[in-house]
Structures are given as C-alpha cells and as structure tokens.
C-alpha cells in the first residue's frame, strides 16, 4: 500500500487553520468555515488525512466539543438545588462578615448580599426550590359518599346593582335552576354561575320546595355578600356567537308584553334605535343593549322569530277593515276634494292662470352668480301631483291601526358601520316632511347656494312640453307606454297622476346626477322611502319636522300654501294644526327610516343644520343596512 508523502510538502500557509468564528454565528457559521477549508484543500489535491488530523486537534474545536458534552450531561441530569434555604444562608454570612477583616472583597460581598435585587433573587430561588408555588388544599374527608354530587359555594358582593340572572323551577324535579345569565351583569362578570346550575341554598337558607318568587324575595332582602350553594351544570355553555347590530323597526315595551319571562329584565326600545345583540342562544328571547349606553348590562328582547309570530297573530286577530286599508285612492281623492271648503274668490279662473303661474315660476328656477343654473323638480304640476296622489295613500296607511307596513316588515334590520370612500359616489339625500313645513324651500336654497355641488333629479312626465319648456330640463317627456314600462319595471322611485298626466322620478334620473359627482337632493313621500333604500343609492333620509303650532303661527304668518284649488293661500290655524298632527303620524309610522331630524323653526338655521347633516352623511361613519355593503347580497 502506497502512502502519499505530499502531506509533508504542505507549506505553513496551507497548514493554517481557520480563524475561530464569531460566537454569534453559532454552529452554522462553524460548519460553513469548515466546508470552505475542505473545498479549498480538495481543489489542491492535498492529503486529507493530515488536514483532518490537524483540524480535530485544533484548540477551538476541542473547546466546542467540551461545551457540547457539558450540555448533553446537563440535559440528562435532573436538577436538584444545593440548598432550599439560600436566603437564610445569606443572612448567616452577613452576621459573620463583621468579625472578618475589613478587606475590599469583604466590603463588596456585604454590599452584594444586602442589595434588594440579590435578596429578591435568593427569595425566588428558595420559593422554587421549596415548591411553595403549588397550592396546598386540605385533604378530603373520608366519609363523603360516592353518590353525592359536587357542590360549589359562590360568594357575590351585591351593591345597588342587580345580580343579572333569572331563575326558574324545573317542570319535573321542581329544582330551582339558573334560567339565564344576563350579559354584563354581576353574575356574568364573576364567571361563577351558569345557566342550568341548581340552587341548593341562598345565605344558608335551603331553597328546596320554595317557589321562584320566594327565592327572589330572599335575594331582594339580602345586601352585601350573598352566598350561594349550587350544584354546577356538567358542561358550562360556551358561546361563540359574533356581535350583531340591528335597527329596531318597531316599538317594544316589556311592561306590555305578558309573555316575557322576566319583566324587570326586559329592554324597552323605540323605532330607529340601534341595538347590540350579545346573546342569541335562546330561540325566543335575545339579550341586547342600546349602543347609546353600552355601560349597562343587557336586557331581554323578543327574537326576530318571536316578534314576527306576534305580528302575524295580531294582524289576523284584527277585524277585516276594507274601508281603511283597501279603499281605492281615486275614491279617497274624490272624497277629499268634496270635503274641502272652496272659496269662489280664490278658485283658479282657467288653465291659463295656472300656466301663467308656472311661467313666472320657471323664471325663478334659474339661479347662480354670473352663470345661470336651472333647478329641476320644482314645477307646480309635479308638486301638486305628488301631494294629491300620495296623500290618500298616506292617509289610508296612517288610519289603519294594523297597517301592512308594520305587519309584514321585519322587526329588526341588521346594520353595520359604513363610511363613504372619496372614490365612491355620493349618497342620495332624501328630504321628508308634511306639506307646508318647508321641504321645497330648503331644497331650493340648498341647491341655489351651491349648484355645482347639489342638484335635483329631472322628473318624467307624459304631458306635452309647453312652449317655454325644454326636454331634459324641466321634465323628461315620454309616452304613457314608456312611463308605465318604467313603473312596472320598478324603475320609478315615485309616481302619480295629475289632470290625466303621469309624473314621477326615475332611478336613472338620480343616477345621472350622482354620475356627475354631485349630491342628489330629492323629497319623497314617506311611503316611497323603501323604493329608494338600495345599495346603489344608499339614501340618507332627513325628516323636516315643524315646530309647535304657536311657533309656526309666528314664523309662517306671511307664508302661503299651494293647493290644486288655490294658487296662493295663507296658512290658517287649522292648516298649522293639521301639519303638526301629520308630522307626528309620519314620525310614528316611518320614524325607523329617518337618519336625522331637523326642526324647521327658522329657515336659515334649518338650512345650516341641513348642510351639516349632509356633510356628516357623506364623510362620517353611519349605520346602514348590512345588505348595502355585503358583497354577497343583491339589492
């Protein structure tokens, strides 16, 4: 066997071992250097045995192997403290130090042992060594029967706040059980009682054989600390439900609901209130709280299913009333016309008088500084058509106590927080209010002050244009067939008939304004709000409310009202009273759709409030129906 002697020919440079690596590089750095050196010598065809011998005998590799062996022994060795009283030992050393010589080392040792950090370290060492961190429980008595159920003693400190739990009697066993735990209450925050727990004693008094009312009386008479002895439920309920927010579409008063399990735990709410649903485990009774006061504990409200069932039962229990709900609008309109007292001096003389009024009105519809802007949607014929066609429908719905609006609608509407992004279209602004409250004047002033930002949609009509009118400016003039096609295709937000002609505002007309980057302002009758509530338009509804009658008598002493009989007629006291009553009915019937309410006591103040409300609607977070922002929902 031949042995190469090339290893003896290695120069000092070739024999140079790699520089010890930086400790921060770790084992990966060492292996990387080793591979580099091996590849270098391999390329030179150097004898590997000599190289490997020198490498394995290098001091830095020997030290690394010693550290590895030490770690392995440390890993296999079970750690046992040398002493469990290191703190006592340190105190004994401190007592002996004064007897020793006063060398600098003795002084330094005294300072170290007296330092707070050193004392804390030794105390922690003794605690771990003695295993004082493990709780010591007393031994169980030997005479406990195997059949006895485990009991829990719960102590709660009751102040002026309610406990936040309801109880019930088991129908078969007669046991007193915790029926439900109210979210946010004292019991829920303690985490010690759960629905289904069996009460055995309250403050040392056995509840066996007692009625729930008697147990409630014991709790009501107790103050300070209340001690419960309970048999816990085998598996405490775990709720994984997400928080849901809804808008109430009806009024609810727990005091008037005979079916509520606990009247005191009920949560009253009004139409339009935003509720936070925190518990839907019960199919009939949910737990919720108002977002206006999230600090209080939740209350019981009927579930969506239960309220719909109540609505159906109430609807079918009412007597059939075709004269209020199903009377034709044409018959109602004729009765209303017959009931109006006509002053012959104020009746329009002929159609020319009406046309002359519209012609004068058309001149006022051009506004702007320097440049003329036309304000569409204010023609007298359109306003009279809307008022005449819709008043009868509104009157019928308001007179019917069991209106179909409340009978078939969902009692809750799920909502989410929405903020319009700068790249999105503006939200449609809808103004609602009784006739004479100033909706049209507010809309006119708003558009007139900034026509480049605000605009009304151009309505449609089937009548022929007059000589001074232009298609697409005052109206979109279409045939009756085209208009009816838009109606049946649900493309009209509102429509009606006046003097044999159809008038209305289409969805496309609103989109035309929004596509220009402007804010579309329109007024609707309350019953037409639903047709505009789509995810494309995302309307923000503002209710213009009149002040009290005495304030209106002062602010509207020179104002005039427009009717189909009177071109201009001053307000009478009965008109003001009727306006106030109609506003109350609108708010009661359709208030759940109103996002904002403005009292028009002073026109300039109301216009300023309107501008502020519109700005908030376009720029700030608002509650909107969840269907408007959900990507999986078709509007």
Swiss-Prot record:
Coiled-coil regions listed: 567-622
Biased composition (Basic and acidic residues): 1-16
SMART domains: GuKc, L27, PDZ, SH3
Residue ranges constituting the SH3 domain according to the UniProt record: 241-311
GO CC field: adherens junction; basal part of cell; cone cell pedicle; Golgi membrane; lateral plasma membrane; presynaptic membrane; rod spherule
Domain of life, source organism: Eukaryota
Pfam families: Guanylate_kin, L27, PDZ
Tissue spec: Detected in the retina (at protein level). Highly enriched in the retina where it is mainly expressed by rod photoreceptors; detected in the inner segment of the photoreceptor layer and in the outer nuclear layer. Also detected at much lower levels in pineal gland, cerebellum, cortex, hippocampus, olfactory bulb, heart, liver and spleen. Expressed in the CA1-CA3 regions of pyramidal cell layers and in the granule cell layer of dentate gyrus in the hippocampus. In the cerebellum, expressed in Purkinje cells and throughout the granule cell layer. In the olfactory bulb, expressed in mitral cells.
Cellular location(s): Cytoplasm
Record note on quaternary structure: May interact with GRIA2. Interacts with MPDZ. Forms a complex with CRB1 and PALS1. Interacts with FASLG.
Function of the molecule: May play a role in retinal photoreceptors development.
Protein family (similarity comment): Belongs to the MAGUK family.
Name of the protein: MAGUK p55 subfamily member 4
Organism: Mus musculus (Mouse)
Gene (name only): Mpp4
């Amino acid at each position: 066997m031949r042995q190469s002697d090339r290893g003896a020919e290695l120069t000092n440079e070739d024999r140079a071992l790699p520089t010890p690596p930086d400790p921060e590089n770790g084992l990966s750095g060492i292996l990387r250097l080793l591979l580099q050196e091996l590849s270098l010598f391999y390329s030179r065809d150097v004898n590997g045995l000599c190289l490997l011998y020198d490498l394995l005998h290098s001091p830095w590799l020997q030290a690394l192997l010693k550290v590895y062996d030490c770690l392995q022994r440390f890993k296999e060795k079970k750690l046992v403290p040398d002493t469990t009283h290191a703190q006592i030992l340190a105190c004994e050393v401190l007592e002996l130090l004064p007897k020793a010589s006063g060398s600098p080392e003795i002084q330094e040792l005294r300072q170290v042992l007296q330092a707070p950090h050193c004392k804390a370290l030794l105390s922690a060492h003794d605690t771990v060594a003695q295993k004082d961190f493990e709780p010591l429980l007393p031994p169980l008595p030997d005479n406990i029967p195997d059949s006895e159920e485990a009991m829990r003693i719960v102590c709660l400190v009751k102040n002026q706040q309610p406990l936040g739990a309801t109880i019930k009697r088991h129908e078969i066993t007669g046991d007193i059980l915790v029926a439900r735990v109210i979210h946010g209450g004292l019991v829920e925050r303690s985490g010690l009682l759960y629905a289904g727990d069996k009460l055995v004693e309250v403050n040392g008094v056995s509840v066996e054989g007692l009625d729930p009312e008697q147990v409630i009386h014991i709790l009501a008479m107790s103050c300070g600390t209340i001690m419960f002895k309970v048999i816990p439920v085998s598996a405490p309920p775990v709720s994984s439900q997400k928080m849901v927010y809804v808008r109430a579409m009806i009024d609810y008063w727990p005091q008037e609901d005979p079916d509520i399990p606990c009247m005191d735990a009920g949560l009253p709410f009004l139409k339009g209130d935003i509720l936070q649903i925190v518990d839907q485990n019960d199919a009939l009774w949910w737990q919720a709280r108002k977002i206006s006061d999230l600090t209080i504990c939740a209350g019981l409200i009927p579930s969506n299913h239960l309220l719909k069932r109540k609505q159906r039962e109430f609807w079918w229990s009412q007597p059939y009333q075709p004269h209020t709900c199903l009377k034709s609008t044409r018959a109602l309109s004729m009765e209303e016309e017959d009931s109006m007292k006509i002053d012959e001096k104020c009746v329009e003389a002929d159609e020319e008088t009406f046309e002359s009024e519209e012609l004068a009105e058309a001149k006022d519809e051009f506004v702007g500084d320097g440049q003329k802007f036309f304000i569409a949607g204010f023609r007298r014929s359109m306003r009279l058509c809307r008022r005449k066609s819709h008043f009868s429908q509104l009157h019928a719905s308001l007179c019917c106590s069991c209106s179909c609006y409340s009978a078939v609608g969902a009692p809750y509407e799920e909502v989410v927080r929405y903020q319009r992004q700068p790249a999105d279209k503006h939200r449609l602004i809808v103004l609602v209010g009784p006739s004479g409250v100033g909706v049209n004047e507010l809309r006119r002033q708003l558009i007139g002050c900034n026509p480049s930002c605000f605009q009304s949609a151009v309505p449609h009509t089937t009548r022929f244009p007059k000589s001074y009118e232009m298609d697409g400016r005052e109206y979109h003039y279409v045939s009756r067939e085209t208009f009816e096609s838009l109606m049946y295709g649900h493309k009209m937000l509102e429509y009606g008939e006046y003097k044999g002609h159809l008038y209305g505002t289409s969805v496309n007309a609103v989109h035309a304004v929004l596509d220009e980057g402007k804010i579309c302002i329109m007024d609707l009758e309350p019953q037409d709000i639903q047709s505009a509530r789509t995810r494309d338009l995302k309307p923000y509804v503002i209710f213009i409310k009149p002040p009290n009658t005495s304030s209106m008598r002062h602010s509207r002493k020179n104002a005039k009202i427009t009717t189909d009989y009177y071109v201009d007629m001053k307000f009478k006291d009965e008109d003001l009273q009727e306006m106030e009553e109609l506003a109350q009915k609108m708010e009661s019937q359709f208030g759940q759709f109103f996002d904002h309410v403005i009292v028009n006591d002073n026109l300039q103040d109301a216009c300023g409030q309107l501008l502020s409300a519109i700005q908030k609607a376009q720029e700030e977070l608002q509650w909107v129906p969840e269907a408007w922002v959900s990507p999986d929902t078709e509007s």
